[in-house]
UniProtKB/Swiss-Prot annotation:
This is Inner membrane-spanning protein YciB. PANTHER family: INNER MEMBRANE-SPANNING PROTEIN YCIB, INTRACELLULAR SEPTATION PROTEIN A-RELATED. Coiled coil: none annotated. Its main location: membrane. The chain crosses the membrane at residues 3-23, 24-44, 49-69, 76-96, 121-141, 149-169. It is a multi-pass membrane protein. Plays a role in cell envelope biogenesis, maintenance of cell envelope integrity and membrane homeostasis. InterPro entries: YciB (IPR006008). It comes from Cupriavidus necator (strain ATCC 17699 / DSM 428 / KCTC 22496 / NCIMB 10442 / H16 / Stanier 337) (Ralstonia eutropha). It is found in: Cell inner membrane. It comes from the Bacteria. The gene is yciB. Keywords: Cell inner membrane, Cell membrane, Membrane, Transmembrane, Transmembrane helix. GO terms for cellular component: plasma membrane.
């Protein structure tokens, strides 16, 4: 359910684009993200740092799109977010010797240190590649194709990557012996 809640602004962006245009969709995405953050705050009295980052990025890039009436800015938004994730994952290891993927998952999964390092690097590489791919689609295809890619293509690639990671991780997880 959290996954669908997190997709709320993207789904509304997609619907608004189909019903109107990129500028209406951008305004809807900004409003939906503000409402989403407000709801999270109302329910939990706490908002995750990444949700604040997402709000900041949609406000800046979406705002620039609306003020300057230039869709290029909103098309850069996913790339900036993906690259921030990639830099965050690699930077935390290089600068603070902290593996963020491990910090998020180690309560659910036990893995050897080298596997955690590869997993973190794989996610950083995935996000970096997704940023490049987003720009490729944004500049080589129509705005409509980019909007479709933003919802279906990027989510599909994320799902494929998660499944591939799960298969790869299953080979490295310790077996539970039941006597």
């Amino acid at each position: 359910m959290k996954f669908l809640f997190d997709l709320f602004p993207v789904i509304l962006f997609f619907a608004a684009f189909k019903l109107a245009d990129i500028y209406t969709a951008t305004a809807v995405a900004i409003g939906a993200t503000v409402l989403q953050i407000g709801w999270v705050w109302f329910r939990h009295r706490k908002v995750e740092p990444m949700q604040w980052v997402s709000l900041l990025i949609i406000a800046v890039f979406g705002g620039a799109t609306l003020v300057l009436h230039n869709e290029t800015f909103i098309k850069w938004k996913p790339t900036v977010l993906y690259w921030m994730f990639a830099v965050g994952l690699l930077g935390s290891v290089i600068g603070w010797r902290k593996n963020l993927i491990r910090a998020m998952m180690e309560k659910q999964v036990t893995l050897p240190d080298p596997v955690w390092a590869r997993l973190n690097a794989a996610w950083a590489g995935f996000f970096a590649a997704m940023g490049v791919l987003n720009l490729y689609v944004a500049y080589q295809f129509s705005t409509e194709a980019w909007v479709n890619f933003k919802l279906f293509g990027s989510m599909g690639l994320m799902l494929v990557f998660i499944v591939a990671q799960s298969v790869w991780l299953s080979r490295h997880m310790p077996e539970n012996s039941q006597d």
